[in-house]
Swiss-Prot record:
TM annotation in the entry: none
Record domain Fe2OG dioxygenase: where: 198-298
Name of the protein in question: Tet-like dioxygenase 1
Species in which this protein is naturally found: Naegleria gruberi (Amoeba)
Substitution effect: H297N: Strongly reduced enzyme activity with DNA containing 5-methylcytosine
Impact upon substituting N147D: Reduced enzyme activity with DNA containing 5-methylcytosine
Lineage: Eukaryota, Discoba, Heterolobosea, Tetramitia, Eutetramitia
UniProtKB keywords: Dioxygenase, DNA-binding, Iron, Metal-binding, Oxidoreductase
Length: 321
């Protein structure tokens, strides 16, 4: 039987090499944008050197360590950066680089402004606008979904222009920055993502198996979730990238339980645990706010995958029972 993926997605060679546990890298995955080498526990490596005299984490040293990695990886400086431990009072208004860490040094949230090249932001924004002109929905997906189904399935949007543009053009380029980001802030997330079904990467052209497209304009504000919520289906922190053109006082992401507003702008990236912290997006009164959310549901590892659309996958699932 010819699957949906075979009909619509070009086969891509994905090579994965598993290293012996205890060596410098326990797994390496080769992607079109280069290899990703990961050390388990890398994100909390050298924690002993980040302790203060009382045995607690030295926030200044931890911040310097994170900024050093980000500066080297992204080849840019992040000025006026701040750091908070997760159980401390978070910054109320975030406009510069910001990290929230656990007491073992692992990153709960990372905000890095102006990570994407301006030309890339403008190119994607222009194309998204062209695509949205012919769409009625303000959301869309690429990759896999599971939602309330007992299996993972190929999102129907992959047969449409938006889904194809995401998977074939956007995701391969954004994945380059995702790899950089996760290398700096969460090797644990990389380890989890590369442990998933190889077919997910071939389908979505990204470390994350799923991508959500969210369009927000003053005229279409009614479609979205307007109450603070958690992304309870997620298993890893998500990586969010922003496009469009909107005022820097609007469209912020608010982590309501922490009284923290992150004033994101086009070109920025935000990494955080949406399944742990309640959040909501503020209104905009002008312009256009586009958010791309790269995520992984719990079901991506625990549920079967039939490499087909929801309807056809349901039929296969019933036949296997």
């Amino acid at each position: 039987m010819t699957t949906f993926k075979q009909q619509t997605i070009k086969e891509k060679e994905t090579k994965r090499k598993y290293c012996i546990k205890g060596t410098t890298a326990n797994l390496t995955q080769t992607h079109p944008n280069g290899p990703v080498c990961v050390n388990r526990g890398e994100e909390v490596a050298n924690t002993t050197t980040l302790l203060d005299s009382g045995g607690g984490i030295n926030k200044k040293s931890l911040l310097q360590n994170l900024l050093s990695k980000c500066k080297t990886t992204f080849q840019q400086s992040f000025t006026n950066a701040n750091i908070t431990l997760k159980d401390e009072k978070w910054l109320k208004n975030v406009r510069t680089a910001y990290f929230v860490c656990d007491h073992d040094g692992s990153v709960e949230l990372a905000y890095l402004p102006n990570v994407l090249p301006k030309e890339l932001v403008e190119e994607f924004t222009e194309k998204f606008e062209s695509i949205q002109t012919g769409r009625k929905k303000d959301t869309g997906y690429s990759g896999i979904l599971d939602n309330s189904m007992p299996f993972n399935y190929v999102t129907a949007d992959l047969s449409q222009e938006l889904g194809q543009y995401l998977s074939e053009i956007v995701n391969p380029q954004i994945n380059y920055y995702i790899s950089k980001l996760l290398t700096c802030v969460s090797s644990r997330t990389i380890n989890y993502l590369v442990s998933l079904n190889d077919s997910y990467y071939a389908l979505n052209n990204c470390l994350y198996p799923s991508t959500a497209f969210n369009s927000l304009k003053p005229s279409n504000d009614g479609h979205r979730i307007r109450k603070p919520h958690k992304d309870n289906l997620d298993i890893t922190p998500s990586s969010l990238f922003y496009f469009g053109n909107f005022q820097n006082t609007e469209g912020y992401l608010e982590l309501t339980d922490k009284n923290c507003k992150v004033f994101v702008q086009p070109g920025d990236v935000l990494f955080f645990k949406g399944n742990e912290y309640k959040h909501v997006v503020a209104n905009i009164t002008s312009g256009w706010r586009i958010g791309l959310v790269y995520f992984a549901h719990k079901g991506s590892k625990t549920k079967p995958y039939y490499e087909d659309t929801q309807k056809n996958s349901l039929k296969i699932h019933k036949e296997t029972k």
